[in-house]
């Protein structure tokens, strides 16, 4: 019976330490020191008036024209390859296949910056 009591005394302080590791949120913390367990509960942070005033000031100074998105990037590549007539490659007879030269390095097809690896 004494061995069970000793084992329980050894396990209980470790259980208090494990609580902080098993929690899914950082809203509370548990620590064990000398057999006592202390649970600390923190309130979630809310937006302060100072932070809200700063964000409002920041939005007021941002020029809107600079952040507008273009429909296409100015350096974006134009359509480099014309489609095959009737979607058929005249050299191989492939229907609906990729247009242009065969893959050049590492066996990759690359069109407009997108790579397909075969």
From Swiss-Prot:
One example of a Gene Ontology biological process annotation: cellular respiration
Pfam families registered for this protein in UniProt: DUF1674
GO molecular function, one term: enzyme activator activity
Function: Plays an essential role in the assembly of succinate dehydrogenase (SDH), an enzyme complex (also referred to as respiratory complex II) that is a component of both the tricarboxylic acid (TCA) cycle and the mitochondrial electron transport chain, and which couples the oxidation of succinate to fumarate with the reduction of ubiquinone (coenzyme Q) to ubiquinol. Binds to the flavoprotein subunit SdhA in its FAD-bound form, blocking the generation of excess reactive oxygen species (ROS) and facilitating its assembly with the iron-sulfur protein subunit SdhB into the SDH catalytic dimer.
Main location per the UniProt record: mitochondrion
Gene Ontology cellular-component terms listed: mitochondrial matrix; mitochondrion
Signal peptide location: none
Subunit description: Interacts with SdhA in its FAD-bound form.
Alphabetic keyword roster: Chaperone, Mitochondrion, Transit peptide
UniProt cross-references to PANTHER family, sorted A to Z: SUCCINATE DEHYDROGENASE ASSEMBLY FACTOR 4, MITOCHONDRIAL
Transit peptide extent on chain: 1-30
Name assigned to this protein: Succinate dehydrogenase assembly factor 4, mitochondrial
Localisation per UniProt entry: Mitochondrion matrix
Name of the encoding gene: Sirup
Cell wall biogenesis/degradation is among the record's keywords: no
Region (Disordered): 65-118
Cross-referenced InterPro entries: SDHF4 (IPR012875)
